[in-house]
Amino acid sequence: MTAIIERAPAKINLGLDIQGKRPDGYHDLSMVLVSVDLCDYITVDHLEEDRILLTSNCPRLPINEHNDVYKAAYLLKERFQISTGVSIFLDKRVPVCAGMGGGSSDAAAAIRALNQLWQLKLSPRQMIDIGMQIGSDVPYCLFAGCAQVTGKGEVVKPINGRLSSWVVLVKPEFGISTRTIFWDIDCETISRVPIEDLVSAIEAGDYQRLLATMGNSLEDISIAKRPFIQKVKDKMLQSGADIALMTGSGPTVFALCQTEKQANRVVNSLKGFCKEVYKVRTL
């Protein structure tokens, strides 16, 4: 079998609601996620030596067991007793530490690619079980698209509707620790997001209701730590974006626009204000 290439799209949160804290210390989340056409690419091929060889065009990334792609390959290799090696190339295009699920999407793409390369014939449930050992975002990233995600991330329900929109992404120069943000959550006072209403809006194709029901429970916490996030949001809205919202625990902010002309205005307004700006579309 020849080399296999899988794309690993970034994701954004149209809605993120914190529903409470679990006895195990994790938080129960309900999210609406959608993929965008900013993608990494994973290429896998057979290797005669019995080892995992991971390389990348991004020198910032570890290429050992600290990388989620490597973890995915190791878990599959051990579980199914694969006696040959594999070479994996990660073509990195999604910003690192951006809150867009880049690492999780890379791991998911590696699982899909290795499932083909090694002819494992894994069921969706088996892939999800492997993915959850790597990270809570991996199950969604295995299937991508537009979906509602609940629990710790392991329950993924596709949404019967399609959001076709231009998206402007801004990745500030700083990162944010997800663990720190979740540590500061007060479930009694945190802002809530009407996820079920958001899902209904997408299913009905009601763009205005979509905008009215979008939100992120973590946004206020992250903005308190990094006020620049609010400045980016303000800049986007002032230049004509339909909505501006932080994705995940940040720091990336995105704007939705119905037309490319509108998206171009938002992009132009950010020149000289932010270095990493991307104009993409929802998938």
Curated annotation (Swiss-Prot):
Its EC number is 2.7.1.148. The keyword Kinase applies. Keywords: ATP-binding, Kinase, Nucleotide-binding, Transferase. One of its GO terms (molecular function) is ATP binding. InterPro entries: GHMP_kinase_C_dom (IPR013750), GHMP_kinase_C_sf (IPR036554), GHMP_kinase_N_dom (IPR006204), IspE (IPR004424), Ribosomal_Su5_D2-typ_SF (IPR020568), Ribsml_uS5_D2-typ_fold_subgr (IPR014721). ATP binds at residues 95-105. It catalyses: 4-CDP-2-C-methyl-D-erythritol + ATP = 4-CDP-2-C-methyl-D-erythritol 2-phosphate + ADP + H(+). It is an enzyme of class 2 (transferase). The active site is at residues 11, 137. One of its GO terms (biological process) is terpenoid biosynthetic process. Catalyzes the phosphorylation of the position 2 hydroxy group of 4-diphosphocytidyl-2C-methyl-D-erythritol. Belongs to the GHMP kinase family. IspE subfamily. This is Putative 4-diphosphocytidyl-2-C-methyl-D-erythritol kinase. It comes from Streptococcus equi subsp. zooepidemicus (strain MGCS10565). The lineage of its organism: Bacteria, Bacillati, Bacillota, Bacilli, Lactobacillales.
